[in-house]
Amino acid sequence: MSHSLRVIFAGTPEFAAAALAAIHSAGFQVPLVLTQPDRPAGRGMKLQASPVKRYAQEHGLAVAQPPSLRRVGKYPAEAAAAIDQLRATPHDVMVVAAYGLILPQEVLDIPLLGCINIHASLLPRWRGAAPIHRAIEAGDAETGITLMQMDVGLDTGAMISEARTAITADDTTATLHDRLAQDGAKLIVEALIELERTGKLAATPQPAEGVTYAEKIGKHEAALDWRRPAAVLARQVRAFDPFPGGVATLEDGTSIKLWAAVARDTQANGAPGTITDVSPEGVVVACGEGALRLTQLQKPGGKRLPVREFLAGSTLAVGQRFQLPETK
């Protein structure tokens, strides 16, 4: 089935690529795709195209990669050229998903039917850059996707529709990301079909209550603070998979990445950070409240391993201690 609605798409990572694929596969015209410039990645630090760019190129869609869309700052000429290109490209609506660039009012005003954003939280909770990570880290029982009509604020636009999903005890950012990407793809196609049919989408202003912000995840957050409750640390490990991973550093300076852990309510005998039990079922570490059983670990230069395999090639012993990060 083909559609007459013309959609400019702006996005960068896998989350956005799922939406672009759904829009294109549903038969909507996509005259232009915006994505961030290629970035160095991998061990060789070679320039790599974004997942959105790869999809666009594989399907013959035009791609633009401006470093900015703002006429002020480091790239005014590039921004001006990109804005001219947007104006010159016949389209009806713009869809934005994890694009990574700020869209000024000048850009938001170009599409006749506005700009729709696919955001990975139940707004107004977790506005900002890392909503999936922060929802898991906070222990939220559910999260979801919100479609909103974009304005110049940070995820402050009126809400068009939402899809909810429970956060399970086993969910990591990786698993929840994939589920939400599919939910977002389905939701945006439904919205575009409705927009094509009626020429407008009903939208509800976000409530003033319940606003929280999902700050970007930094590598400095990876170190586990064993003075915290075990339940909090278990959520942190899940939230930081696949990036940046939980990190525990032994007193000799050896850093171990932690990829799976289970909180135990029983208080371990030992100061926070002390290994109190080592077995094929897990490495138990004392915490401020309860204890954390580590079940998937990775040594420097190695790969993720179940604890049984990890212990076969690494010596961890009862009484060893992990460092406590400095508190601010």
From Swiss-Prot:
SUPFAM superfamilies: FMT C-terminal domain-like (SSF50486), Formyltransferase (SSF53328). Keywords: Protein biosynthesis, Transferase. It catalyses: L-methionyl-tRNA(fMet) + (6R)-10-formyltetrahydrofolate = N-formyl-L-methionyl-tRNA(fMet) + (6S)-5,6,7,8-tetrahydrofolate + H(+). One of its GO terms (molecular function) is methionyl-tRNA formyltransferase activity. (6S)-5,6,7,8-tetrahydrofolate binds at residues 121-124. InterPro entries: Fmt, Formyl_trans_C, Formyl_trans_C_sf, Formyl_transf_N, Formyl_transf_N_sf, Formyl_transferase-like_C_sf, GART_AS, Met-tRNA-FMT_C. GO terms for cellular component: cytosol. It holds the Pfam family Formyl_trans_C. Signal peptide: none annotated. Belongs to the Fmt family. Attaches a formyl group to the free amino group of methionyl-tRNA(fMet). The formyl group appears to play a dual role in the initiator identity of N-formylmethionyl-tRNA by promoting its recognition by IF2 and preventing the misappropriation of this tRNA by the elongation apparatus. This is Methionyl-tRNA formyltransferase. It comes from Paraburkholderia phytofirmans (strain DSM 17436 / LMG 22146 / PsJN) (Burkholderia phytofirmans).
